[in-house]
C-alpha cells in the first residue's frame, strides 16, 4: 500500500480522496492555486503546496508544477479526482514516467475513450449497442446528407473530442444540416483544438442511464449497477439517483453485460463509467468516463462499496476481492448537486463569499462538501459547493429525506440552486419517475413558481439572520468600543506614570 498520495484537484473531491486515504493509513498532499489558499482541502491535508495563480491553466492544469510538488513531497502516487487532468492520457503517462503511480486507469484506456469516433469503433467491435450514425468523421456535406437521410432526421452533429454537450447541434432537415456542421466544427476547433465531427440519429426523449465499472490490473472487471442521470441542464447533470426508477433486473443485467464488454475491450483497470442513452426499451453507448464520477456517491450508498478506496487499492496492485455475484443493490439513493448559481436567471454562476453555512444531517443524509462559513466561491472554477446525498429503503423515502435535508440546508452569501432542487422534488413527473434528458426545459414553466417561493424563503432567512448578526455586532462593537476607551485611558496613565518615573 502507498505511504503518501498527492491529490491533483480541489474542492469536495479532494476532501473525499483525503478521507479515503486516511482510512487506509495513507498520508495526503494537497495542491492549491492562489485563489484556494484558504480552501478546506488545503487546510485538511497533511501537507499542502501552492502550484500557481488562480487560472486553472496555470495551476490545476500545470503538469510540471504538480510533478515538482510530487517529487518534493516524496509521494508514491497521484490521484487526479475528476475534471482538470483526470482524463488526460499524457498526464497519466507523465506521472508514470516520473516514477509515481497514477490512481486511475492505464493511459491507453484513457486515450482510447478520449475520441468519440475511436470509442464508437471500439464499441462496435466489442458488440456494444450504438446509436445509428456515421462510422467515422464527416468529410463533406453530401456525405452528411446521405447518412442523415438513411437514418432519418432529426440528427445530431457531435464533436469527436467534445464533452459536456460542447460542439453538439441538432439538425431537423438537410437545409439545416450544412449550417449545423459548420457551427459544430468551429466550436470543436475553438474548444478542443480538433474540428472533427460525426453524425448520429437524434433521440427525441431519451433517459441518461450509466453503469459503474470496477476493474483491476489482474484482468478482473465487474459492474456495480446503474445510475439515473437524466435531470440535466445544458448536458450538465443536476440530480442523480441509484437505481434508475425504470430499472429491472433483466435490463440491469443486459446493460451491465454491455458495460463489461466495453471495459474489457480497453483492458480497463480502475473505477470508470459507461454512459448509455435509453429510449423505447433500447439502450445505446454514449461515452465512457475513465475516472471517478461526481455521482459515484449514490452507487456507494446502495452497494456499500467505497469506490475511492477501491481505486487506491487497485492502483497499488491489489486484486479485486469482489465477484459479480457479491454486488447487491439495496435501497435507493439520490444526489443533488448544490451549485453557486441562480436558477431564476438561467443558472448563471454566482461566485462570492459564504457568510453563513449550516449543512443538514439526520438519518440517511450524507454531504460531500468543500466549503465552510467564510469560504470564497472563486469565479475561476466549477460552481459546485457540495453534493447532498440521501438514502432510503425506497425511492419515496430517499425523496422525503432529500426534501427535509434541502429544507435544513442554510447557505447565505451566495445564490444557490437549492430552490430548483426543492421544486423538482415536488414535481409530479419527477415523483412518478417520468423523466428524460429534456426534463428541465419541458417542466421549467411549472418549476419556476415554486423556485420563486423557495428563493423568497432563502431571502427572508437571510434578512432575519442579517438582522440578528447586525444586532449582535452592535453589542460587540459597543463592548469593543468601551474596552478600547478603557485601554486608551490606561495607556495614557502609563505614559504619564512613565514620564514621571
From Swiss-Prot:
Pfam families: Biotin_carb_C (PF02785), Biotin_carb_N (PF00289), CPSase_L_D2 (PF02786). One of its GO terms (biological process) is gluconeogenesis. Its cofactor is Mg(2+); Mn(2+); Co(2+). ATP binds at residues 116, 200, 235. It comes from the Archaea. The active site is at residue 291. The keyword Acetylation does not apply. The keyword Flavoprotein does not apply. Its EC number is 6.4.1.1. It is an enzyme of class 6 (ligase). Gene3D superfamilies: ATP-grasp fold, B domain. SUPFAM superfamilies: Glutathione synthetase ATP-binding domain-like, PreATP-grasp domain, Rudiment single hybrid motif. Pathway: Carbohydrate biosynthesis; gluconeogenesis. Inhibited by magnesium, when its concentration exceeded the ATP one, and by high concentration of ATP and alpha-ketoglutarate. Optimum temperature is 80-90 degrees Celsius. It catalyses: hydrogencarbonate + pyruvate + ATP = oxaloacetate + ADP + phosphate + H(+). Residues 1-445 form the Biotin carboxylation domain. Optimum pH is 8.5. InterPro entries: ACC_Biotin_Carboxylase, Acetyl_CoA_COase_biotin_COase, ATP-grasp, BC-like_N, Biotin_carboxylation_dom, Biotin_COase_C, CbamoylP_synth_lsu-like_ATP-bd, PreATP-grasp_dom_sf. Residues 120-316 form the ATP-grasp domain. GO terms for molecular function: ATP binding; metal ion binding; pyruvate carboxylase activity. Heterooctamer of four A and four B subunits. Pyruvate carboxylase catalyzes a 2-step reaction, involving the ATP-dependent carboxylation of the covalently attached biotin in the first step and the transfer of the carboxyl group to pyruvate in the second. This is Pyruvate carboxylase subunit A. The lineage of its organism: Archaea, Methanobacteriati, Methanobacteriota, Methanomada group, Methanococci. The gene is pycA.
